[in-house]
Amino acid sequence: MYDNLKSLGITNPEEIDRYSLRQEANNDILKIYFQKDKGEFFAKSVKFKYPRQRKTVVADGIGQGYKEVQEISPNLRYIIDELDQICQRDRSEVDLKRKILDDLRHLESVVTNKISEIEADLEKLTRK
């Protein structure tokens, strides 16, 4: 799993926290950030440079002229797909944790209100 990332020398893809991608001249710059260890101020990161792929395409659709366009490298596209899988999984785990905590807080509030209601009923019975 994550063969493209492993081919870059990333031995523990599960430690990836996030990534950034920017274009610089004729290159795409991929920067991968790893989870911070306790006591670290900055996350560890690695940077990779990919030349943009050049293609010549028909400029106007009629066949009168051609123009050169640049696209992201196919290898980089595969790497980004793997990074998206990792980062999306982390996001969904965080969302699930948030949902569970919200449900727990709601349950706590319902139980607290029910206890107050029962105590009030008991108080009414003891006054008689």
Swiss-Prot record:
Which residues fall in a coiled-coil region? Answer: none
Q: Which InterPro entries match?
A: UPF0325
The UniProt family comment states: Belongs to the UPF0325 family.
The name on file for this protein is UPF0325 protein YaeH
Endpoints of the signal sequence: none
Its domain of life reads Bacteria
